[in-house]
Amino acid sequence: MAHYNFKKITVVPSAKDFIDLTLSKTQRKTPTVIHKHYQIHRIRHFYMRKVKFTQQNYHDRLSQILTDFPKLDDIHPFYADLMNILYDKDHYKLALGQINIAKNLVDNVAKDYVRLMKYGDSLYRCKQLKRAALGRMCTVIKRQKQSLEYLEQVRQHLSRLPTIDPNTRTLLLCGYPNVGKSSFINKVTRADVDVQPYAFTTKSLFVGHMDYKYLRWQVVDTPGILDHPLEDRNTIEMQAITALAHLRAAVLYVMDLSEQCGHGLREQLELFQNIRPLFINKPLIVVANKCDVKRIAELSEDDQKIFTDLQSEGFPVIETSTLTEEGVIKVKTEACDRLLAHRVETKMKGNKVNEVLNRLHLAIPTRRDDKERPPFIPEGVVARRKRMETEESRKKRERDLELEMGDDYILDLQKYWDLMNLSEKHDKIPEIWEGHNIADYIDPAIMKKLEELEKEEELRTAAGEYDSVSESEDEEMLEIRQLAKQIREKKKLKILESKEKNTQGPRMPRTAKKVQRTVLEKEMRSLGVDMDDKDDAHYAVQARRSRSITRKRKREDSAPPSSVARSGSCSRTPRDVSGLRDVKMVKKAKTMMKNAQKKMNRLGKKGEADRHVFDMKPKHLLSGKRKAGKKDRR
């Protein structure tokens, strides 16, 4: 099926936008910093890359344009002729040809300047070669200004064309302007074509879709056609001629019985005879429209003879009225049936059908005598069929039960389960429990094993295996157990005391704590230590012991005094109050010190989760190049 979608063609930029886009992309996607003290091969590569990158961008965009636009020789003749009428085939091909030439010129310019750049001996010379190469490429594109603008207009118009499938089932409406073609398509499809009481309201092709016999149909509304030579017809009329020539459709030739369109029945008949060659090998129906104003029976004899002659030639004439919808469905049905029959007949005449038919052979046996041999059906089968026709089925289905019980019905599929024990049908045992398959843990002989275990236990109980009394423990073991019990109770008390304190600050180590003598003696007694001889204990002896008597210093001769008189030394002023004149100033200094310590205290409680790494290099300030007028950012 030839199906074309011209809405996917990419936008064709103007020459100025084309150049700006490409050069901007080159500046963004290639390095921008080079210095003259770099090695010459690095400088050459820097500018070669810019030239090649620009050439590749031009090449890709131009190739995309050439690929997206349809080739007139490859598409369906209907679209080829329609594009020739709307856009002029020669102009269209010239524009695409110029784009193709521009693409080749850009490639050649890049190739030449890359070759010259290999011999550049300085940064300045390589830069000038790059500048010349990009300039020549832009000049080539600038000369394609008119071609690019023309192709953009063609693209916009193509995207607005209706999607017409030339090979599907189609009904085609044609006739003089203002005879009711657009009103008919609005009635049979969901199209919304503008209808006005003047000629040439429809200036292009319109498509509507409908369903008939579960098939999809398209109805094409063509602009009105006037009766004059083909060379004198304008673009609007030629669209209708193109559709008639190329679309394999059922043609509905619409005539105005009331002659309100401004053309008599004779003129409409002459137009019919003029375009009759376009109706060859197509089902044709003459639609006599506006029968609500005037019917065929009310016409003069000469006008009635027009429709009589058409019917005698094999063209059905159907009276319709799009205002009252009389005959509209009849026309639709007749046209669709004729087109379906015509398509089947055409396929039967084709080679493809003959190839299939040649492979098929219908074997018909020849009669050997005149004796009748009807098919044999056993009497039991015949009787069963009669019972099935008269009697109801014995087994009730779930649907029958649902209808009988109504709201009380509950779907129960477990009653059909085929189990060994029928009472287990409704046991609620899951198939999967906590990721384990229940079937893996079910032993079919589990009840038998349980009975064996119960018998074994009864035998053991009868033998008195469980009647033996445990041996009495000795005194040493009882003391150990009692001591262990006291230790466990002591641990529990310690835990409770610790919970009551609930200290959250730093804890002082046990060796640094001051131990009171009474507390120590109490703890030792609770642990079972005999404290009767506590006065001779080590800690009591150490407490009573006085300081060792030092050896008396030998008296020395007095030296003559270095000074006549010396006043007694005074104590040094504390640092936290030195330099402060009064109490008020001391309080103020302490307040300032406390406020300064707040931040440090907060950071002191900071954990690993409170860490934050600040962005020391914000990209929006440090990315890009420092151009003129941008240096105040950093």
UniProtKB/Swiss-Prot annotation:
The modification Phosphoserine is found at S122, S468, S470, S472, S558. Residues 495-517, 529-634 are annotated as: Disordered. Residues 544-554, 586-604, 619-634 have a biased composition (Basic residues). InterPro entries: G_OBG, GTP-bd, NOG1, NOG1_N, NOG1_Rossman_fold_dom, NOG_C, P-loop_NTPase, Small_GTP-bd. Keywords: Acetylation, GTP-binding, Isopeptide bond, Nucleotide-binding, Nucleus, Phosphoprotein, Ribosome biogenesis, Ubl conjugation. Residues 560-572 have a biased composition (Polar residues). The modification N6-acetyllysine is found at K103, K522. Coiled coil: none annotated. GO terms for molecular function: GTP binding; GTPase activity; preribosome binding; RNA binding. Transmembrane segments: none annotated. Pfam families: NOG1, NOG1_N, NOGCT. There is a cross-link at K103, K332, K534 (Glycyl lysine isopeptide (Lys-Gly) (interchain with G-Cter in SUMO2)). It is found in: Nucleus, Nucleolus. Belongs to the TRAFAC class OBG-HflX-like GTPase superfamily. OBG GTPase family. NOG subfamily. PANTHER family: NUCLEOLAR GTP-BINDING PROTEIN 1. NCBIfam families: small_GTP. Associates with pre-60S ribosomal particles. Interacts with MINAS-60 (product of an alternative open reading frame of RBM10). Involved in the biogenesis of the 60S ribosomal subunit. Acts as a TP53 repressor, preventing TP53 stabilization and cell cycle arrest. This is GTP-binding protein 4. It comes from Homo sapiens (Human).
